[in-house]
């Protein structure tokens, strides 16, 4: 092979590799990554494309469905199918739905001033305001209020995600300056009602305030069950987001201060030490691994996702709804497919709470 021919082949190979890398860089963002972009990016054509996607995915009720990558490139056939689904009754705040779409649309409109994005935004904001119960809580789904969908939902930070959005609107954060005063005032009122609901749903055990259940009854405000493995309990996971939200209040009332301190006391009391929750590769398991608890005296603190309200013991539940006190006793599919232990309260105790105390006094 001649040197010239070899050089030519190398040059062609270089072009192919360069094109491949460049093309990889141009791949459309996923929806989670689109939410993480800098403000400057929202002036881009890609941001415009994704914002227009959101208009197609938006339901007639005003909200959005969950578990969908709304940043994908849609074909004409995709668009036709989605437009035909607009009447579906699956608008939800579960799994970071609706409030994240509204956050994206606000940033897109602020950057590009496309009126259609503002119109969709206001429709979604009105949906959230309408979905709020008179007692201040939000259901997981609206207007579909079947089964546990109707419960006030803290699970996976659903209600807290909505309240953060409304708080930022009320506070006139830069990306929400286009919101009219009437809606801004409604957002502020909704946040205050939400805070009242949080305070009223904090579970009291033996005369002491503790934390919250992942769901609460929309009428009685009592802790409520959801799926078969999500029973009435004290939540070591969702309660972290609730406390952080309460800590973000600039001028907390005495009731808010008392709520925070009581929850922190519960987290201190309920932490689990000397253990790790690890995934061990195991091809015989459904997920390809098995999660097990191992002893480790150097491990940082953990909290169970759920605690028995009366005894404060960690509980673990499979799809048969039978309570176990050892995670190893529930079936493979649930044991390895759910976050039974969490460590999110560690930073709350070691960093967030001390800073809050410094700001608001002992």
Task: Outline where the language-model segments fall.
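Bacterial Sec-dependent N-terminal signal peptides
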Residues: 1-26
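Terminal, non-catalytic domain-edge segments
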Residues: 25-50, 168-193, 219-226, 230, ...
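Solvent-exposed loop and edge beta-strand segments that line ligand/cofactor-binding
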Residues: 35-43, 82-97, 146-159, 225-238
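N-terminal carbohydrate-binding/catalytic regions of secreted carbohydrate-active enzymes
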Residues: 44, 48-104
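Long, well-ordered core segments of solenoidal/helical folds
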Residues: 49-62, 120-137, 188-207, 259-276
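Residue-level signature of the C-terminal ends
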Residues: 57, 108-111, 131, 169-172, ...
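Intrinsic, low-complexity N-terminal interaction/targeting segments
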Residues: 64-65, 69-71, 78-85, 134-145, ...
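Eukaryote-skewed repeat-based solenoidal scaffolds used as protein-protein interaction platforms
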Residues: 118, 122-125, 129, 146, ...
